[in-house]
Amino acid sequence: MRRSISSKAKSFLHRNLLYSGNSGTSPSSSFSICGFCFSRRAYSNGSDYREMLRNGIRFMKLDDSLDLFFHMVQCRPLPSIADFSRLLSAISKMKKYDVVIYLWEQMQMLGIPHNLCTCNILLNCFCRCSQLSLALSFLGKMIKLGHEPSIVTFGSLLNGFCRGDRVYDALYMFDQMVGMGYKPNVVIYNTIIDGLCKSKQVDNALDLLNRMEKDGIGPDVVTYNSLISGLCSSGRWSDATRMVSCMTKREIYPDVFTFNALIDACVKEGRVSEAEEFYEEMIRRSLDPDIVTYSLLIYGLCMYSRLDEAEEMFGFMVSKGCFPDVVTYSILINGYCKSKKVEHGMKLFCEMSQRGVVRNTVTYTILIQGYCRAGKLNVAEEIFRRMVFCGVHPNIITYNVLLHGLCDNGKIEKALVILADMQKNGMDADIVTYNIIIRGMCKAGEVADAWDIYCSLNCQGLMPDIWTYTTMMLGLYKKGLRREADALFRKMKEDGILPNECYV
């Protein structure tokens, strides 16, 4: 028999609502969706909506779901709360969490009752929207209304904490939950193990695995995948392979996610041949590689200038019906640009729009850098203009890439215009930006202007780094200003920045 949860739950809520700083927020104060237009689709009788919920709900689009909701609230007698729960759950699976919250509020206004199931759906939507303060506030409301939280309720909250990088709060709630007499299931353990692994706390995750097994809960493929991914991310390659052996001995077989984690680790460590071996092992096990598998392998091949093989892999994935996304395209375009085959990259860039793949900031930035390195600045600037025209927002890396290209080619005035535009658009320059400008000015012999930029850094709230000092000192030396360069060297050491090998 579980002990009453009210006192412990309330103390937990108080602690966490204070943390989030939003204890008084109600669901409706943060979420409202205006302007939903419900088309009045004709339903011949009350059984039609039940037929839709029973057989057609998996294939429904959002508009159809909204039409169905509108019809259901018009029915007399009203459909059961179980029917409403089924519909809300389906919309939640579409990841339209804000819509679920809105519809739940409409149900409240219409006096449609709720149960634990509908409450759990709403609470999960708050967590998925990263609105943990609202989720905790709503948990308090649930308890007041007499709905005792279930293991599903806690699962949603734990997932919300882990997704919000609040794994310690997740562990605290886990302990409170166990203290109240709830028995965690494999899903609960998996949620926290995954959160710990993503927070680089793999040893704690392994401890929790031991605790899980002592509690008589057997790990599944999801448990092992989280641990293998965490071990790989922490560079513990041998531990990861041992974990694979361990799961296989228990007759828990690796899936596509497992192999993707191993391939990712191999590629990051430069062990592309081993990554290919894992890929071949997948094929032997009759596992279909997914877009992540292919993208990782293409990245590894491009990294080692094996472009012909990367192209072949790209073509092969398409032939298998696995169509590349923006990430895959960007990887291969980057491979071409780094191998000085920027025109091949441009061809792929054009192919993206033909295939309906939307280019993102990374794609544009890669191509701009490719043309800058090829000395084709006019093309790079044109791509930048097209990017802005298409509504794709340049980030600081995009600006720095373009500025680097302009400064390297002696176009300092144009670089300063771009810098001014960037600041006008609300983008704050970072120390890398100013290092690029200082380097460009020094290279062009405009050391006095570079010095002015250097002196303005404090006013911009920026601290010079090793590259700022290095570049500025080189510029001063080249101008014969040795005394000024030596003074700057001393200033650098006073600031606690150690000289690199170029200046020792």
Curated annotation (Swiss-Prot):
Annotated Gene Ontology cellular component terms: mitochondrion
Organism phylogeny: Eukaryota, Viridiplantae, Streptophyta, Embryophyta, Tracheophyta
Source superkingdom: Eukaryota
Signal peptide: none
Presequence boundaries: 1-43
Places the protein is found: Mitochondrion
Family designation: Belongs to the PPR family. P subfamily.
Keywords: Mitochondrion, Repeat, Transit peptide
First and last residues of every PPR repeat: 45-79, 80-114, 115-149, 150-184, 185-219, 220-254, 255-289, 290-324, 325-359, 360-394, 395-429, 430-464, 465-499
PANTHER family found in the cross-reference section: PENTACOTRIPEPTIDE-REPEAT REGION OF PRORP DOMAIN-CONTAINING PROTEIN, RESPIRATORY COMPLEX I CHAPERONE (CIA84), PUTATIVE (AFU_ORTHOLOGUE AFUA_2G06020)-RELATED
Gene3D superfamilies: Tetratricopeptide repeat domain (1.25.40.10)
Species whose genome carries this gene: Arabidopsis thaliana (Mouse-ear cress)
This protein's name: Pentatricopeptide repeat-containing protein At5g16640, mitochondrial
